[in-house]
Amino acid sequence: MENTELTALVSEMRAEFQIPPYYEDSQLANLAREGECTVGSLNPGCNITTDLTYRMLLKNYMYYAYHHRVSEFMDNYSSVILTWQMETEVDVNGTA
């Protein structure tokens, strides 16, 4: 993830989840990088800029990580992750 995208993601996260100002951007950036490795590895090749499901999953992963509840994220979002993986398995032309 590029720095511009990381900065935008941190800003979105702070606004959407009402993260207090005393929680530093660098800490949120660390959660984003951690989430990129965790969530991104579940569906390699997806782009955070164009894939809105990936973006949503990453922000929610960051929120759960912020509250130290990563295992609950995996339990709660497993069906969304599976659907996301299945949707991106087939390309636009309908071929595998």
Each language-model region and where it sits:
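Conserved short "hinge" loops at termini or chain/domain junctions
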Residues: 1-56, 67-69, 87-96
